Amino acid sequence: MAVVTLAEMMEAGAHFGHQTRRWNPKMSRYIYCARNGVHIIDLVQTAVCMNNAYKWTRSAARSGKRFLFVGTKKQASEVVALEAARCGAAYVNQRWLGGMLTNWTTMKARIDRLKDLERMESSGAIAMRPKKEGAVLRRELERLQKYLGGLKTMRRLPDVVVLVDQRRESNAVLEARKLDIPLVSMLDTNCDPDLCEVPIPCNDDAVRSVQLVLGRLADAINEGRHGNNEQRGGGDAEG
């Protein structure tokens, strides 16, 4: 059975690429045609790639690999958080901070600081501080929660990075490749398929397209971990 149908992808608008002048020639094998100055992605190729990505991701999850979802653009942010949480993956959905992977020791210290501040807040310790000091601590807490909240369950570097927008998340791509962390990437027509191990050619700007792809990948992770496809079920938190 196909992981995703052509009808589902059409309905999600997964076939719409970018303007032809913005294309990357390396994506030519995934492009069906051009209409009104816009490239149309070959959804037959996308379906094949989705099947491959599902199997690859399921196998990685079955072998205990840990996943990091990355997507900071407005239309992807909420979906990234929801689907990552559903399959127990870590996520970055606000802004990629330089060194999130390549300077992991420092980043882990910031995550530990976030956990400490959350414990202080829940225990009432911050409320007991002088008003000015408490305000400073709460501002620090809010900032850390915004940018690092999705990484609290990540005790070490991820084994796989799942990416929504390769061009926007170019720093994440560079860091993952520097550390030889494989990338499962949604690729619009302006992307470079050579910069990822598992390509998924599709519209990476439409919310429904992002929902469709990340939803299936989250299903694959849950199936790999739990032995069945737990659609819309809760995933285990990464420990």
From Swiss-Prot:
The record's PROSITE patterns line, in alphabetical order, gives: RIBOSOMAL_S2_1
Q: Which InterPro entries match?
A: Ribosomal_uS2, Ribosomal_uS2_bac/mit/plastid, Ribosomal_uS2_CS, Ribosomal_uS2_flav_dom_sf
* Protein name as it appears in the record: Small ribosomal subunit protein uS2
**Which Gene Ontology MF annotations are present?**
structural constituent of ribosome
Fetch the SUPFAM superfamilies from UniProt. Ribosomal protein S2
> What keywords are annotated for this sequence in UniProt?
Ribonucleoprotein, Ribosomal protein
Under NCBIfam families, the record lists: rpsB_bact
Q: Which GO terms describe its cellular component?
A: cytosolic small ribosomal subunit
Q: Does the entry feature the keyword Ribosomal protein, yes or no? A: yes
Q: Which GO terms describe its biological process?
A: translation
* Gene name as annotated: rpsB
Give the UniProt family note: Belongs to the universal ribosomal protein uS2 family.
UniProt source species? Parasynechococcus marenigrum (strain WH8102)
